[in-house]
């Protein structure tokens, strides 16, 4: 796999999960920052259709609290973009809870288009935390990097 990096971030594949209880395959990457010798968070890419990932999104990320505010989630998404394109995707869905202002800003900085806010269906509620009742859904049109 080609090295995945963007600006101050490098991604390292932590795990590829091919099939778990009927879920689509997914990749888990550690987010590393060049200036720090330990992971600052994680980013996940979930293979599959828009319908499968309408509420969880194709991409999920978390940045550890001490490292927040440095745009690492944004940079990790950008580092992942070419890899996702290489898998045959031209767009992905990214979601966040309506009250997650940091994620909303990250997603909007990527240029993703807001689609709608929807309540999480009751049959999917077990996959989310108790406080997650709705999701803001965004469509991110991927761009091949021009050199």
Name each region found by the language model.
Residues 1-7, 12-17, 23-147:
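Acyl-donor (CoA/ACP) binding surface of acyl/acetyltransferases
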């Amino acid at each position: 796999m080609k090295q995945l990096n963007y600006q101050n971030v490098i991604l390292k594949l932590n795990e590829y999960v091919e099939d778990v209880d009927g879920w689509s395959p997914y990749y888990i990457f550690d987010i590393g920052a060049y200036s720090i010798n330990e992971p600052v968070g994680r980013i996940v890419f979930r293979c599959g259709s828009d319908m499968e990932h309408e509420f969880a999104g194709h991409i999920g990320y978390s940045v550890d609290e001490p490292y927040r505010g440095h745009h690492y989630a944004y940079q990790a998404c950008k580092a992942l973009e070419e890899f996702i394109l290489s898998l045959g995707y031209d767009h992905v869905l990214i979601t966040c809870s309506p009250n997650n202002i940091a994620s909303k800003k990250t997603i909007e900085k990527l240029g993703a288009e807001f689609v709608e806010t929807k309540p999480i269906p009751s049959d999917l509620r077990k996959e989310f935390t108790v406080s997650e009742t709705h999701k803001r859904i965004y469509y991110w049109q991927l761009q091949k990097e021009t050199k």
